[in-house]
Amino acid sequence: MSLVLLPNTAALTSAFLRSQDEVSDLVDDRVYTILPNSKTFPLVRVRRIGGTAGTRFAHWLDAPLFQVDAWADTAAVAFEVTETCRAALVQRFSGIYHFTGVSGVVTSVEAGGITEGFDPDEQTKARGRFDAVVMAHPAPDLTSS
């Protein structure tokens, strides 16, 4: 019997956001799970900050809590990027996904409200953020035997 491995939901979520035209129109492909040393703004980071995995009966369903941050030069752009990411996740992120290096099935997304402000580490950059729970489980094996 082989182990059931849950998908890397942070990688799945960031790949999904990069695939959305409305997001890429604002940030190109700058949706990260780890921020680069050399940053070009605006940009987005998806970071797992908690959550649970449904392991009581079967190791199958992951319910990670993510913090999604968007940085930009102005508060207006930071809000637009943040709300665009939130809307894309809540309205579209459901179903079977296969991106390079990561696959999974997203069953639901619950997102919190947006917090606005300036980043204490990047005081000249505006930041918007929200939290979201992305319910996901492994994608079905699409290979034939």
Whereabouts are the PLM-identified features?
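Short C-terminal domain-edge/linker segments immediately following a structured domain
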Residues: 74-81, 97-102
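Short, hydrophobic/π-rich interface segment
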Residues: 80-93
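Charge-dense, low-complexity intrinsically disordered segments
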Residues: 3-7, 72, 122
